[in-house]
Amino acid sequence: MSSSTEIERNLELEILCKNIQCADKSKRQAALNELLQSVSKQSTDEDLKNLLDLTYLHLVKCYTDKFEAIRSLAISIVNEFLKCFQTRNEFFLDYIIPTMRRRIGLPEMVEESEEIQLELLTQLGHIVEKFQSNDTDTLMRIYNDIMDILVRNLTNRYANAHRECCKAIQLLATATPSFYMRAESLVDPLTELLCHRQSATRTIAVETLGVVCLYITNKNDKIVKSIVSISPLLTDSVAAVRRMCGIIGCKWLIELRDRYSFFERIVPLVLCCLKDDLVDIREEINTHFIRCGEQFFDENQQELQRIELIDHEYPCSNYVALVTKTRPTLGCRALVEKSLRMINIIVKEMLDWKEPVRLHSLKLLWEVVLFAEKAFTCKFIEVFPALAKACQDDENSVVKEAKRVAFLMGQLLNYNDWMEITMRDLKKFPNCLGILRCFNSLFAGAEIEHKRNSVEEIAKLISTSEMCHNLNEGYQSALLDLIEQMVNIHLTKIENESGEEKYLFEILVKTIALSNAHENNEIATRGLSLYETFCKTPENRVFLQGMHMTDVINDIEDLDCEHSERSERIIMLFGCIKLCGFQKEYFSSIQTAVKLVLENSTANAQIKILSGLSMAFLNWNHENMQGSAMNLLSIFIEDILEPVLIWKAGRNAESIRAMATQALCSIGCSCPDEAREIFPKLSKNLISLIEDELAVTRAYAIRCVLKAGPFLYEDYRHLVTEILSRLDDPCANVRCLAIECLPQLEVNPSDDMFSETGYSSLVEYIISRLFLYLDDPYIKIRPILLDSLAKLQKKHPVVFENEIKKLPTNYLYNDIIEDLKSARLE
């Protein structure tokens, strides 16, 4: 370049610099635009350096210009210088960084424009990137200025500034070896950004915090704070945030200093991502975690190689089908095994009051069990109480996940160890639904060979009154799940043990009996289906009942106390009677139990048991009685029913008498031969019941008379009188039964008190009274009345003809006479 050209160029630059300092904003702006174009036209670093030497003071001053456009242009010019320089120029470190600090790095933010703040932070990132070096620490002398800027702007109100700041931090970490000196000062502001409402900010904050922790030395509390702050983001609603948590966790497992001390806190970050809802996240994090395992294997090769020699088979036969993926590598499993101290944190979160936290911790526990396998057995005693509580949770999703975890434990853990602990807790807390559900899932996951040897021990414990006598619907459902498993195992055995069979039978009967407490019949339906499966055949069912029902009835304790109809003991007795009925072997046990209830319990409880007796008597099986039905029924009626049939004052007494009469009627329906012999002995009770206040009692009493055999003459007379009095009963059903009963009422002619004349007079009186009710307005009575008259005509033709002659001659009676004479009613 000629000297004249150079002089012209310098004059132009002097004019340009003068215009940059001009008071007129438009001139300053035009001059800066001209300078920007001039920078891009420089071809060499020497030319750029000369240009910069003439203009840098003016540019630095423009950083503080009162107009935002001027400040923005100055920043753009410096960026262009930075871009065009092939070599490093100390100007950026000596002048620009300190200027930045004064503008955006002080506690009181000088720069008011958010856009300029963002431009300055972006420029800071470019400068750091330009001056990064592996040889000389060029950034060392202005390191504190840069850190002041970064720390201050992490608390900026502007979200974009946060993200630019995080990018600059990541660049600075690799740009200077001195980054570790103040790295811990970034932890607190970065952890605050983890709660930012924008997901992009949360994501880059996690990434930056992960990088910063790699350079923290002798500040373990800061690393712990970082991990604890990141952990809640594992349940973030945005997938990118969760993914970054897993990536940082894997990065820490590989690169973090003293990482072995933090394994129990870092590993959960990775394992939680392995249970993420998105397949892409699970696959990506799994790839990273495999590399972590490989590094851990290499670092502990001598120890793990010995394990590798014997660790080539799956721990259980259906392992792959269970977890739907291949078995984790030995390095990953060893890494998790070394981190089992994390269980303390997981257990604490399993007891948290927030449902998402409990669910999240259970998913994490599932992964820990999967990787730790048998090594987790040593932690089972710590986890089991919290897992049992989770199984009793109000949230169905939590219960479902807790049962999955328990099932996996049953698959992978040492059977004898967890069985000993759970059996101990079942005995200690016999009515705990959570423990029962947890045990059920554990047992379901265990190998069939182990379970076969434990069925009798478990069934013996479950059959006790403390465990089995529970009215809770959820508890009964869980109990049925466990029983179903044990029954299926029992049925696969070639030789069934008698003790095991006895306990399983008792549990099934008790559970079905107690299901009567609920309106929902699902439990009863399941129980009955399982009961039929267990018994196999009706004959075997009868045999099992005869063998074991005495013990079931005797297990119902404290029946000599006052119980209501909702008492577990009353419901149990009612259900047993209803399900199994009567057999000779346990007839006396039922009789004793029912007697205690009728003597001590409330009226409603007595009514419930009597209704159960009615249903049982309707299903009476003579084959089960082995020819002793007459004797057993006589004793039962005399000892149990007859005292209840005696009249007592009060509404409760009326209801009890009604149910007792119904039970007596059921005997008459199912045991007609026995009833013909037994019922005549109850004539005095029946006479009293026929005039009872309750219509239903009167109806059942007359039905009992219909089933009875010949009565003694005096009893017959009183019965005729009482039944005839029921022809005027306010209840039409009672009137119909009375009319039906009169022709069927029998007298014993061999009785010493029997008188033929008196008997004929009674028959005449019966027939004459029946004729009087032919005009009853109740439409159903007339055919019953005519049928009864026809039976009396056939049974006593002479007396009947004499009574017809006494009838008045009118159209009603003439029609009846004609019908009877023509035998159309026979």
Give the role of each language-model region.
Residues 1-826:
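Extended, low-complexity, acidic/polar intrinsically disordered regions
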